[in-house]
Amino acid sequence: MEMTFHATTIFAIHHNGKCAMAGDGQVTFGNAVVMKHTARKVRKIYHGKVLAGFAGSVADAFTLFEKFEAKLEEFNGNLQRSAVEVAKEWRSDKVLRRLEAMLIVMNEEHLLLVSGTGEVIEPDDGILAIGSGGNYALAAGRALKKKAPQLSAREIAQAALETAGDICVYTNDQLIVEEL
């Protein structure tokens, strides 16, 4: 049995000029034990102008969070440049390369997925989701954005995570939703 702490399911959306990111609170030890129900995996950083969320190994995610925050400071809040620099360092550093986590970062203009393989991806539709319940949240969010455009970014983010929590055993209903 794998004995690491994992944190899962983050959803982010740009919709009708607003942005929101939601994450659940569950931290799982290995594949069988829920160790925490109220982890905070979505945060406002860089003077409240950037939202960041993580999924994956908790310790690894915190390491990446710190590196990303440092890059934001270094590049005066330039989200894209900071994400690219973190991805380059993550991929090329022998120690960082072993980190098992993913980040979603966003500001009012950009929404980016940052992965350990050096990927920095900006979605065409303004929606991203990661973690074990990510595909469920992504499907729910896309359907809501398309079929219920009157909903706010926050409402879509919350509903997408609630749907993922109803389906995925590694996602709970203790949600944090942040907006810009």
UniProtKB/Swiss-Prot annotation:
<dbReference type="InterPro" id="IPR001353">
    <property type="entry name" value="Proteasome_sua/b"/>
</dbReference>
<feature type="binding site">
    <location>
        <position position="171"/>
    </location>
    <ligand>
        <name>Na(+)</name>
    </ligand>
</feature>
<comment type="function">
    <text>Protease subunit of a proteasome-like degradation complex believed to be a general protein degrading machinery.</text>
</comment>
<keyword id="KW-0479">Metal-binding</keyword>
<keyword id="KW-0888">Threonine protease</keyword>
<feature type="active site">
    <location>
        <position position="8"/>
    </location>
</feature>
<keyword id="KW-0645">Protease</keyword>
<feature type="binding site">
    <location>
        <position position="168"/>
    </location>
    <ligand>
        <name>Na(+)</name>
    </ligand>
</feature>
<protein>
    <recommendedName>
        <fullName>ATP-dependent protease subunit HslV</fullName>
        <ecNumber>3.4.25.2</ecNumber>
    </recommendedName>
</protein>
<dbReference type="GO" id="GO:0004298">
    <property type="term" value="F:threonine-type endopeptidase activity"/>
</dbReference>
<comment type="similarity">
    <text>Belongs to the peptidase T1B family. HslV subfamily.</text>
</comment>
<keyword id="KW-0963">Cytoplasm</keyword>
<dbReference type="InterPro" id="IPR023333">
    <property type="entry name" value="Proteasome_suB-type"/>
</dbReference>
<dbReference type="Pfam" id="PF00227">
    <property type="entry name" value="Proteasome"/>
</dbReference>
<dbReference type="GO" id="GO:0051603">
    <property type="term" value="P:proteolysis involved in protein catabolic process"/>
</dbReference>
<feature type="binding site">
    <location>
        <position position="165"/>
    </location>
    <ligand>
        <name>Na(+)</name>
    </ligand>
</feature>
<dbReference type="InterPro" id="IPR022281">
    <property type="entry name" value="ATP-dep_Prtase_HsIV_su"/>
</dbReference>
<keyword id="KW-0021">Allosteric enzyme</keyword>
<comment type="subunit">
    <text>A double ring-shaped homohexamer of HslV is capped on each side by a ring-shaped HslU homohexamer. The assembly of the HslU/HslV complex is dependent on binding of ATP.</text>
</comment>
<keyword id="KW-0915">Sodium</keyword>
<dbReference type="GO" id="GO:0009376">
    <property type="term" value="C:HslUV protease complex"/>
</dbReference>
<keyword id="KW-0378">Hydrolase</keyword>
<dbReference type="GO" id="GO:0046872">
    <property type="term" value="F:metal ion binding"/>
</dbReference>
<dbReference type="InterPro" id="IPR029055">
    <property type="entry name" value="Ntn_hydrolases_N"/>
</dbReference>
<dbReference type="GO" id="GO:0005839">
    <property type="term" value="C:proteasome core complex"/>
</dbReference>
